[in-house]
Amino acid sequence: MPHRYPAAKINKMPKGSVPALQQEMLRRVSKRYDDVEVIIKSTSNDGLSVTRTADKDSAKTFVQETLKDTWESADEWFVR
């Protein structure tokens, strides 16, 4: 389940936060999907890709909501 996060936001993130975000997303998404891979890439545009699932719309909505919750709760899980 590849995931891309906006380059502008990634470039402004503290050192070490991209791997931490990837691990936290993996932890959260794995609760719903057994065989999951989370990939965070720095790109020039916003995008979210969800692949290898029967119900892509449902999976994409779940991942978007999970990403939003994860991003908003960074103070709780990101240790610098």
Swiss-Prot record:
Cross-referenced Pfam families, in alphabetical order?
DinI
Record has DNA repair as a keyword: yes
Keywords on record:
DNA damage, DNA repair
Q: Which SUPFAM superfamilies match?
A: DNA damage-inducible protein DinI
Domain of life where this protein originates:
Bacteria
User: DNA repair among the record's keywords?
Assistant: yes
The Gene Ontology biological process annotation of the record reads: DNA repair; SOS response
Q: Which InterPro entries match?
A: DinI-like_sf (IPR036687), DNA_damage-inducible_DinI-like (IPR010391)
PANTHER family per the record? DNA DAMAGE-INDUCIBLE PROTEIN I (PTHR36572:SF2), DNA DAMAGE-INDUCIBLE PROTEIN I-RELATED (PTHR36572)
Q: What is this protein called?
A: DinI-like protein Z2083/ECs2153
Per the UniProt record, the source organism is: Escherichia coli O157:H7
